[in-house]
């Protein structure tokens, strides 16, 4: 079990981005579609770093927007593997919003993304062959 825990820890992914005008909506907050795009990207990187296999998103589950993300702020996206199946895994992504010129930081969005590993024929393949 420790090997799995170590593999999960090594796969954690953290990315920072600035919220620029091209990603905001008419309320000058981060557009929901842009948020989902960033979250899926971080989840994909996390899944790939964990498995080192070809991974595809098969679902995004329960994405909760709990705090607005104003333009001119910073966001940190953190992806962690939370479940590993035979051919699929689940990644939880947390998005924190930070003020640029203060220490204020809030958890703004959370979501869960499921990925499946594919072989060269694009069929599901085991993520951890031989692992128990």
Question: How would you label these PLM feature ranges?
Answer:
Residues 2-15, 69-71, 82-132:
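HotDog/MaoC-like acyl-thioester-processing domains
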Residues 2-59, 116-132:
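Hot-dog-fold acyl-thioester-processing enzymes
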Residues 19-23, 60-67, 97-99:
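Short, well-ordered turn and helix-capping elements at secondary-structure junctions
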Residues 52-73:
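Small beta-barrel nucleic-acid-binding modules, principally OB-folds
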